[in-house]
Regions:
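N-terminal subdomain of nucleotide-sugar transferases
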Residues: 1-65
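Carbohydrate-associated surface elements
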Residues: 173, 195
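A short helix/loop element that forms part of the nucleotide-sugar donor recognition site in Leloir-type
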Residues: 202-215
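A conserved nucleotide-sugar
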Residues: 218-219, 233, 237-283
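Short alpha-helical donor nucleotide-sugar binding micro-motif in glycosyltransferases
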Residues: 287, 295-300
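Aromatic "clamp/platform" in nucleotide-sugar-dependent glycosyltransferases that forms part
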Residues: 308
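Short hydrophobic beta-strand element within catalytic cores of glycosyltransferases
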Residues: 325-328, 338
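Conserved acidic donor-binding segment of nucleotide-sugar-dependent glycosyltransferases
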Residues: 340-341, 345-352, 361-366
């Protein structure tokens, strides 16, 4: 198949770890790679955010990244991009009409990309599949007045659900949300999870990881992810402070803005650790390159991800692929990916006491950690490889393409 993948704010070329970069960037890059290895050809359309970017950038064999104009060629927070989305649409139309071989369908990622896909279905006759990655109703419910989504988001998501030929939900929780909050047509929903590269994220000798990273020996808890309030890192620090002193545990927090050593969130979290008298046991590493993350997961006795809410959650997959047990919030995709009592534990969000209890259990029982480590790696290889995800996505895309009338690319 010839696929047009739209990801307006999350380029596969982007650095990870910033406020608006993370799981979607990984998803788009890895899914595109695996689809290409299956013989599909893809153009990934994203917004040009630098004057140095050419229009077309070869990414992998069979994959090109197409940088389209949409507002200033600089970084813009994703919630401020909608005023430029019509410009993005028009540039997409021009490119799509000029490609030698017409696209079979569009795969839209995030709601603004879905808006473009709705327009392209109407004007170019292109069928489309949608992956939301996050839902506006959930964000509004969880963030309240702090939600910075533009007012057009809700109507756009409703339109997308009415017009999409297929919606790829990443977890059962998202299926429930689409049905209950949006009245989605269940016949057009397909469960396609996110994945992880099990060659990149694989077990590593813990003592070697400690030595290479300069982490002192002893029980180690690791957090990897963005440093924004909804990720619940404050809950983790509060829980860590409840652990008994005799454990002599260390907390390593990996994440932050690329190239930025200090930020308001790091200051807030550091001050909290100081207030709770554990600052000397907490290390903030700042943003780290993807290739280094395996070492941090490998150094951990347990990885923690306890967001207030999370549409899916990629870091639990990465940790489990590295054979590291995970304690995660019972929210979103985490409550499915982490098998409670088997590959780690699930706890309520914003509950430091519950989290501390599970951390103490894992840090105090090496046999339990070993058992969960083996189960974690096994679960990932059975259910969450990118190859598995690509096969599920291809099946959905093929059904969409087979049911679509053939439309001239010049329509």
């Amino acid at each position: 198949m010839r696929l047009a993948m739209i990801s307006e704010h999350a380029s596969p070329l982007a650095a990870l770890g910033g406020e608006d970069s993370g799981g979607q960037n990984v998803y788009v890059a890895e899914l595109a790679r695996r689809l290409a290895t299956m013989g599909h050809r893809l153009d990934v359309f994203t917004r040009r955010d630098s004057t140095l970017l050419p229009t077309v950038v070869p990414f992998e064999r069979g994959v090109r990244v197409v940088n389209l104009p949409a507002g200033p060629a600089e970084s813009v927070p994703k919630d401020e991009l909608f005023p430029f989305i019509a410009e993005f649409r028009d540039a997409f139309y021009q490119f799509a009409r000029e490609v030698p071989t017409a696209y079979d369908l569009v795969h839209a990622n995030f709601w603004m990309s879905g808006w473009v896909a709705c327009e392209a279905k109407r004007d170019l006759g292109l069928p489309f599949a949608q992956t939301f990655h996050a839902l506006g109703e959930i964000k509004k419910r969880e963030q309240g007045a702090a939600d910075t989504s533009p007012p057009e988001r809700q109507a756009a998501e409703v339109r997308i659900l009415e017009e999409a030929d297929r919606v790829l939900a990443t977890c059962p929780a998202e299926v429930e949300e689409l049905l209950d909050l949006y009245g989605a047509d269940p016949a057009r929903l397909t469960l396609v999870p996110c994945g992880v590269d099990v060659r990149k994220f694989r077990p590593v000798d813990q003592s070697k990881a400690h030595k290479k990273l300069g982490i002192p020996d002893g029980p180690t808890v690791v957090y990897v992810g963005r440093l924004v309030p909804r990720k619940g890192v404050d809950t983790l620090i509060e829980a860590f402070a409840l652990l008994p002193d005799h454990l002599d545990a260390r907390l390593v927090i990996v994440g932050g803005e690329p190239g930025v050593e200090v930020s308001p969130e790091v200051d807030r979290l550091s001050n909290l650790a100081e207030k709770l008298k554990v600052r000397e046991k907490v290390t903030f590493t700042g943003s780290q390159p993807q290739k280094e993350l395996r070492l941090y997961y490998g150094a951990a006795d347990v990885a923690v991800t306890v967001p207030h809410y999370e549409p899916f959650g990629m870091t639990p997959l990465e940790a489990m692929a590295c054979a590291t047990p995970v304690v995660g919030s019972r929210v979103g995709g985490i409550k499915t990916s982490v098998a409670d009592g088997e590959t780690g534990y699930l706890v309520p969000p914003k509950d430091p006491e519950a989290l501390a209890g599970r951390l103490l259990r894992l840090l105090s029982d090496g046999a339990l950690r070993d058992r969960m480590s083996r189960a974690a790696r096994r679960r990932i290889k059975e259910h969450y490889t990118w190859e598995h995800v690509a096969h599920l996505a291809t099946a959905a895309f093929s059904e969409v393409a087979a049911g679509a009338p053939r439309i001239s690319k010049t329509a």
